[in-house]
Design a protein with these regions (language model features):
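A positional/architectural concept
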Residues: 1-22
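Glycine-rich hexapeptide-repeat left-handed beta-helix
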Residues: 2, 22, 27-30, 37-129
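A general structural signal for well-ordered alpha-helical packing
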Residues: 15, 31-33
Length: 129
């Protein structure tokens, strides 16, 4: 976010070692209830509400990940690629392989809510000194 705008939606979480970055004048936009997994790189792109970005995934400039998507661990979403709402995309380069099930959408939202609660517990412990 040092060279552009960084927006993280309500109930979203960015896990350990993940990097959110953009070029000068660019932007990173995470919707609501997004989970960005450990060591993912999210660079100058948009991620829709309820999506899960897997560990070590890479999202490049101007790509768009729709709502309620799953980007598999280690996937590479190339510059400018659009992943439609409700898609599962994996691989290098990423390819949509199927649609997300209702159970997977619910699990993603539950996962995001869990990390919000986890964060509140850590904040309370830190406040105790």
């Amino acid at each position: 976010g040092d060279d552009g705008t960084l927006t993280i939606g309500e109930n979203s979480n960015v896990q350990d070692n993940a990097v959110l970055h953009c070029d000068v004048g660019g932007a990173v936009m995470l919707g609501k209830s997004v989970t960005v997994g450990h060591s993912a790189l999210v660079h100058g792109c948009t991620v829709g509400d309820g999506s899960l970005i897997g560990m070590h995934a890479t999202l490049l400039n101007h790509c768009v990940v729709g709502k309620n998507c799953i980007i598999g661990a280690g996937a590479l979403v190339p510059e400018g690629m659009v992943i439609p709402d409700g898609s599962v995309a994996v691989g290098v380069p990423a390819k949509v392989i199927k649609q997300v099930s209702a159970a997977q959408i619910e699990a993603n939202l539950h996962n995001a809510a869990h990390y919000v609660e986890h964060g509140k517990l850590h904040a309370a412990e830190l406040a105790k000194g």
